[in-house]
């Protein structure tokens, strides 16, 4: 077994894809998540507390989730509403359009199955960038006529622009502001201060703390952090189109370095194999070079 003290750390990036999904889908953090979603959408918090969060927590051995089309899909009660939540760490050029296609895919799937009433789909984008060059911390989009008199609310889209929550010109809902502060904070000492005195947030804090000492999760977290940053930043800067081969070589080198670091930190070879999809023999070969 791997000694938890070996991998214990003082901070963690909650915006990391693996961490965000695990936190958002967890039963432990359901209270703080429901309060946030309710404040954004105006939907009663109890409905989010009792909703079905498709995919559940990340399953050991199946962490890559290659078949998933969205970060979190929440099936609300008999009202036949679905809420999709997407963490967008980088603007890769088409990320917003791609997420919108997810929302319409869910809508189309529901209409094909035969319906008693038209379904509603809510898409919440948590953006770590400002695609619209907006000042507002929260942007709400829906289908309206050009005179802004009539609207169709079957598909509604929200953008939570993280960078704009420091803008004091807007009266930001306290529940949304607190959640944004939490997910933007990486140091455990600060996360604990934010959560202190709030049972829902303390439960969320403890979940993140538990994740940070899970050997398999943290190995995947580190690998995903390095791998995704390389890929997404390459797309973001436009390098991918011009020098794909060089990027692939860089990612491959980064992958090798991550494997060597995992071995040096004492992570078990079978766990590294699950994370990287490489055989134990391949891992040994890389770590011995």
Q: Model segments located where?
A:
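Accessory alpha/beta interaction modules
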Residues: 1-156, 166, 237, 241
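Short, charged alpha-helical interaction segments and adjacent helix-coil junctions
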Residues: 2-11, 77, 82-88, 177-289
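Generic recognition of short, well-ordered alpha-helical interface segments
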Residues: 15, 28-32, 94, 171-174, ...
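Generic structural signal for hydrophobic core residues of well-folded globular domains
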Residues: 23, 27, 40, 127, ...
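Short, solvent-exposed coil/turn linker segments
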Residues: 44, 55, 145, 161-164, ...
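Short intrinsically disordered coil segments
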Residues: 102, 137-144, 173-180, 223-225
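Short helix-to-loop capping/linker segments positioned immediately adjacent to catalytic or ligand/cofactor-binding
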Residues: 110-114, 166-168, 190-195, 249
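Upstream accessory/linker segments immediately N-terminal to the RecA-like ATPase cores of bacterial MutS
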Residues: 154-169, 175-178, 182-193
């Amino acid at each position: 077994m791997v000694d938890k003290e070996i991998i214990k750390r003082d901070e963690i990036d909650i915006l990391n894809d693996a961490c965000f999904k695990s936190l958002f889908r967890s039963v432990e953090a359901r209270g703080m998540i429901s309060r946030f979603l309710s404040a954004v959408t105006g939907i009663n918090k109890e409905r989010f507390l009792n909703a079905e969060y498709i995919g559940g927590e990340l399953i050991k051995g199946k962490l890559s989730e290659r078949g998933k089309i969205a970060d979190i899909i929440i099936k609300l009660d008999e009202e036949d509403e679905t809420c999709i939540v997407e963490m967008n760490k980088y603007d890769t050029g088409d990320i917003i359009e791609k997420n919108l296609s997810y929302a319409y895919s869910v809508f189309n799937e529901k209409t094909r199955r035969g319906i008693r009433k038209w379904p509603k789909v809510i898409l919440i984008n948590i953006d770590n960038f400002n695609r619209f060059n907006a000042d507002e911390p929260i942007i709400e989009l829906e289908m309206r006529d050009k005179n802004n008199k009539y609207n169709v609310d079957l598909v509604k889209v929200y953008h939570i622009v993280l960078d704009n929550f420091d803008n004091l010109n807007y009266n930001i809902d306290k529940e949304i502001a607190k959640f944004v502060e939490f997910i933007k904070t990486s140091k455990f000492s600060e996360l604990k201060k934010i959560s202190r005195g709030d049972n829902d947030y303390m439960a969320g804090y403890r979940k993140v703390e538990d994740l940070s000492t899970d050997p398999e999760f943290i190995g995947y977290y580190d690998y995903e952090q390095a791998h995704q940053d390389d890929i997404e930043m390459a797309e973001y800067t436009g390098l991918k189109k011009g020098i794909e081969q060089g990027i692939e070589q860089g990612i491959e080198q980064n992958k090798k370095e991550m494997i060597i670091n995992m071995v040096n930190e004492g992570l078990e070879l079978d766990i590294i194999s699950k994370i990287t999809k490489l055989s134990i023999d391949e891992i040994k070969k890389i770590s011995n070079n």
